[in-house]
Every structure is written in structure tokens, then in C-alpha cells.
Regions:
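Active-site- and interface-proximal helix/loop "cap" or "latch" segments in soluble metabolic
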Residues: 14, 21-23, 35-215
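N-terminal "first-domain core" detector
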Residues: 1-35
Length: 215
């Protein structure tokens, strides 16, 4: 259901965040984020002059390139629009994220490397939805299909007698109400990580079965 009807009000500001995930032909992943801000009225900017309604105050983007372990192997950050001429100077410093793995403690480490005056507030904030987009991309059914096809092309077929590797714990578990480890969603889609009262029976029934996570 949508939000309830609002009281009378005047629209002043719009922030848009767009994130996209891509599987690359070399088997890596590109996760891109863009953030824009605009006002609904004309206002002055000392550096850029008058900004009309709809002119972008901020327009900033970042691309993280990840390997299959969610380790960042390359970063590109750009500032196309900003309120101050020096804002874009910090963009190259986002290379400090190279080597960092998206997972537990990711945001804490981002703040340690790029917090305060060592980074751009808006691009740092953008890394939150970018990280979530990475998981949504890599754990999708289509992504698994593309990854298997790539491995086959590269001669990395899995042999029939090769034991299956245990899958990593899905990031969503215990990070969302619906994905509580003892709840029905985990029981259905990730029974190997289910912790409900009938966990032993559920895990035993799922042993050896490949369960495709929903997109």
C-alpha cells in the first residue's frame, strides 16, 4: 500500500540514488551507484552562479569492481556536479577501498579509510546501497547462470565427481525481519542455515540438494 495522503506542503528538494549491477565478460562484477540532488527553486551558488530549479547541485558516481569473493579489485569515483570547486579533488582517494571485502564490518572500514575530511560525505553514503546492490546482483539466478557459462568458456567445468563446496551464508540472514534465521523464509530458501526448533530435520532433508535463491 502507498503512503497515506499528506497534509498540504511544498516540494523543495529531490535526492535520487540509482544503483546498477553488471556481470563483466572477464568474470568480475561492476557495481555502480549515482547520487543526484536538485532544488525545486532557483538559488545562488558562489562558484557556479544561479542554479535554476532542477539544476543538479550534486551529481556523483562510483563504480566498484568485485571478484567472486566480493573483494574490491578496482574503484572509480567521479564528481560531475558539486557546490564547491574542490569537491572532486577527493575522488581519487576512493582507491583506498581496493582490497576491502564487502561483508561484515564493511561500513566500519569504509569510515576508517574515508570518513570525515578524508572522503566525500555523499559518495561515502552511496556505498551503502551500492553494497546491497552487489549482493542483489551476485546472488541472483541470472548471475549464477552467467557465471557458470563464463567458467565453462574458461575451461573451469565442475567435474561430476568433484564434491560441491559449501555455500557461504547469505548476507540477508539475520539482517532483515523476513530473513530471521529461525523464520519461514530461511527455512524455505536457505535450510542449511535454518535455526528454528526443527532445524536438524530441515537441514537433513535439504542435505545434498542445490537450492536456488530467489531473485
Amino acid at each position: 500500500m502507498p503512503l497515506s495522503p499528506p497534509v498540504g506542503r511544498q516540494h523543495l528538494h529531490t535526492r535520487r540514488v540509482t544503483c546498477q549491477g553488471f556481470f563483466r565478460e572477464d568474470g568480475l562484477w561492476d557495481i555502480e551507484g549515482r547520487i543526484t540532488d536538485e532544488k525545486t527553486y532557483e538559488h545562488a551558488n558562489e562558484w557556479r552562479g544561479p542554479l535554476k530549479a532542477g539544476d543538479l547541485v550534486h551529481d556523483m558516481s562510483i563504480r566498484l569492481t568485485l571478484d567472486h569473493k566480493f573483494t574490491i579489485v578496482d574503484v572509480e569515483a567521479v564528481t560531475d556536479k558539486s557546490p564547491y570547486p574542490i569537491c572532486g579533488e577527493v575522488a581519487p582517494d576512493f582507491k583506498k577501498l581496493i582490497g576491502l571485502r564487502i561483508g561484515g564490518g564493511f561500513h566500519r572500514e569504509v569510515r576508517a579509510r574515508l570518513g570525515g575530511v578524508h572522503g566525500c560525505t555523499h559518495i561515502v553514503e552511496l556505498l551503502g546501497p551500492v553494497a546491497t546492490t552487489a549482493f542483489q546482483t551476485v546472488f541472483s539466478g541470472k548471475a549464477r547462470e552467467l557465471n557458470r557459462a563464463h567458467r565453462t568458456r574458461m575451461g573451469h567445468e565442475v567435474k561430476a565427481d568433484e564434491p560441491a563446496k559449501p555455500r557461504p551464508k547469505p548476507y540477508m540472514i539475520d539482517n532483515c525481519y523476513a530473513w530471521a534465521a529461525d523464520g519461514p523464509v530461511v527455512k524455505r530458501w536457505a535450510p542449511d542455515f535454518y535455526t528454528g526448533p526443527d532445524a536438524d530435520a530441515v537441514r537433513a532433508a535439504a542435505a545434498g540438494k542445490e537450492i536456488e535463491m530467489p531473485d
